Amino acid sequence: MFMALRAPMLERMNGLHTDDAPVNWLERRGGRLTSRRRVTLLHAGVEHPMRLWGVQSEAITAAMVLSRKVSAIIAGHCGVRLVDQGVGDGFVAAFAHASDAVACALELHQAPLSPIVLRIGIHTGEAQLVDERIYAGATMNLAAELRDLAHGGQTVMSGATEDAVLGRLPMRAWLIGLRPMEGSPEGHNFPQSQRIAQLCHPNLRNTFPPLRMRIADASGIPYVGRILVNVQVVPHWEGGCAAAGMVLAG
């Protein structure tokens, strides 16, 4: 029953290219598609998908709402939803500018997607462009790892993305810095030296449990739960924008 429901639902969520015209996001920014380039990738996943899809009518309705709204929000921030690169119940979007990706994440969290709640990871780096809307490489993997660390309603980003958006955050947004990780995420291979930051905003939930990861104690035995605490809150107020909610191209 679950698998029979899941297939058409994910087709709606991850197969939007059949209904929506591709967004030539690099052309909008005056760039050209190349085989390898610096890009910011946003990986989003649905929190507790099996619980959400447990009732067919709610699942189908939620998938249709997510499909329409997500595509519009991504395009509105000069991004493009990648083809068949969502993992399970989620999606991936690419942006030429990190500030656009962060602004998109903020709007996704504020969008009326109930009962769907998203967890989002963002990473900036070099990625291999396999096709017009298909990327591969370490940047894709790191963005996915960040998504898997996050909780529903939370956006976490790598240090590379944090550096790229300083001074270019949406109005009233700020970042919470997290300590460098001392181990690997549960079941993943996220770099131990990688910095992680959380996107915060007055209209978002900003307090979450520790990230979903594990570290090893002195004996070298990993266990879940001994991890990051918020160590610094650094507000970055957007300046010079004509209207609230706008970001500078970065």
From Swiss-Prot:
> Into which family does the record put it?
To class-3 of adenylyl cyclases.
The record's annotation in InterPro entries points to: Nucleotide_cyclase (IPR029787)
Gene3D superfamilies listed in its UniProt record:
Nucleotide cyclase
Q: What is this protein called?
A: Uncharacterized protein MT1403
